[in-house]
A protein has these predicted regions:
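Single conserved hydrophobic/aromatic residue that forms the stacking wall/gate
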Residues: 209-214, 218-221
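Pyridoxal 5′-phosphate
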Residues: 197
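Mg2+-dependent phosphoryl-transfer active-site scaffold
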Residues: 1-192, 200-205, 216-217
Length: 221
């Protein structure tokens, strides 16, 4: 089907190619913002179409976030995402180290990778250990989480006195912020999505829009 669609486009536009799908093509995102999503993978449901119109997505990072949020669990965070997306300059971060991690999602924890980055950058976890804690959060293992909450805040030393995990306090994050942040991470981690998966879905969707956009403008179906 895609091969036939590409050939049809090439008949009218010889330079057309599926090999170079622009990730920020204005015409493509204008179509999404206007709700033209019929037949587009991931985006053609009424709810998703409405969300795309509301968000006025401008780039592939917006699409990745929307795909990750439009699921039964994280749907509750969509209003906060839309509000922050609209007023990006007003988004506040509990600690400066969070900005480079959450800036792309306007202060919202959406991806599994973000959860792991927070554990690494604020508390000194290795990414491997951070992923173990993330999985414990998603499975609601309360005994593990209480232990890790203490480690996240205060750190953990090896028998020789060296730090296995430095903890937030030893990295300049105050205790109140660390405790609040752990609770927020725990709430979000239950629903956090793998960004790589969402990115793959977004690229497929963009490819379908890219291949259909010239024919739509010509009224070909």
């Amino acid at each position: 089907v895609i091969d036939n669609a590409e050939k049809l486009n090439c008949a009218y536009q010889p330079e057309f190619s599926m090999e170079s799908v622009p990730p920020d093509d204005k015409e493509t995102f204008d179509m999404l913002a206007e709700g033209h999503t019929v037949g587009v993978f991931q985006f053609e449901s009424a709810g998703m179409t409405r969300l795309l119109v509301q968000s006025q997505a401008e780039g592939i990072e917006d699409l990745i976030a929307i795909i990750s949020l439009y699921r039964p669990g994280p749907m509750q965070f969509i209003p906060m995402y839309l509000e922050n997306h609209k007023e990006a300059a007003r988004v506040k971060y509990q600690h400066p180290l969070l900005k480079p991690i959450l800036d792309v999602t306007f202060g919202c924890i959406i991806y599994q990778e973000q959860v792991m980055q927070i554990f690494r950058d604020l508390a000194g976890y290795s990414l491997g250990r951070a992923d173990i804690v993330r999985r414990a959060m998603s499975k609601k293992k309360h005994d593990v989480l209480e232990k890790e909450r203490q480690i996240f805040i205060h750190g953990q030393q090896r028998e020789d006195g060296t730090w296995e995990v430095e903890g937030c306090l030893n990295r300049g994050v105050d205790q109140a912020t660390a405790e609040t942040l752990f609770k927020e991470i725990q709430d979000f981690a239950s629903y956090a999505f793998n960004k790589a998966h969402a990115a793959a879905y977004a690229l497929v969707a963009l490819s379908l829009i890219h291949i259909s956009e010239p024919t739509r403008r010509r009224g070909i179906s």
